[in-house]
């Protein structure tokens, strides 16, 4: 079974070699974005499956983002520029990660794959994928949903087909003023409370259906069912 999890693999054969375009006939299944297969859902939070299912989450803070310092890919540029724009508008946003860009409310770096402090206490969080590719979405969205945040999100253009749009707010990031007004309105009107039931529903879907192990089980079961003599 092959899961292609990186963007634009087909454009970089020198890096991926035989894995650029593996033959479907040689594997139980090959999951490619360009053939309508989504990324396995993962998370960069420290909590386990059991903890997500059994522990209550209490919100004590308002709005955050967790960013790297990268400023290369389209999404890198959009997310850093948008955070700086929000700061210029006077909208408070706590920034975690790298402070190369001198954020007004920088709160510090976080341990690798452990974004808990920057997500779980917050009602709202913002992030953007590195690229806007159909079926390609990552922890940039799932971390917020698992942490029961209302996530302001840019990236996968057909994300509405994959995750209930009531569980996040999709931004365009081609008109920062318009997106700022959406963010401001959402916080002022407490969309988090309004949408929390949908966020929790999608949290269950991620844990029980969309993440690696449930998906793997379905693929194997389907293969066995269709190849039983």
What are these regions (language model features)?
Residues 1-128, 132-229:
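Pol beta-like nucleotidyltransferase catalytic core
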């Amino acid at each position: 079974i092959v899961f292609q999890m990186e963007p634009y693999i087909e454009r970089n054969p020198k890096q991926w070699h035989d894995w650029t375009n593996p033959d479907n006939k040689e594997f139980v299944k090959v999951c490619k974005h360009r053939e309508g297969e989504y990324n396995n859902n993962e998370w960069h939070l420290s909590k386990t499956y059991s903890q997500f299912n059994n522990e209550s989450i209490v919100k004590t803070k308002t709005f955050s983002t967790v960013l790297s310092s990268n400023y290369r890919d389209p999404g890198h540029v959009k997310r850093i520029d948008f955070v700086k724009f929000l700061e210029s508008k006077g909208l408070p946003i706590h920034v975690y990660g790298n402070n190369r860009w001198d954020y007004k409310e920088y709160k510090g770096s976080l341990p690798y794959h452990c974004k808990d402090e920057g997500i779980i206490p917050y009602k709202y969080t913002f992030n953007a994928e590195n690229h806007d590719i159909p079926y390609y979405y990552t922890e940039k969205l799932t971390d917020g949903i698992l942490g029961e945040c209302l996530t302001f999100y840019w990236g996968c253009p057909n994300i509405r087909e994959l995750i209930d749009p009531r569980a996040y707010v999709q931004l365009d990031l081609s008109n920062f003023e318009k997106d700022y007004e959406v963010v401001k309105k959402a916080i002022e009107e407490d969309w988090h409370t309004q949408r929390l039931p949908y966020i929790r529903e999608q949290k269950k879907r991620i844990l029980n259906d969309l993440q690696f192990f449930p998906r793997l089980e379905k693929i194997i079961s389907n293969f066995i069912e269709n190849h039983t003599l």
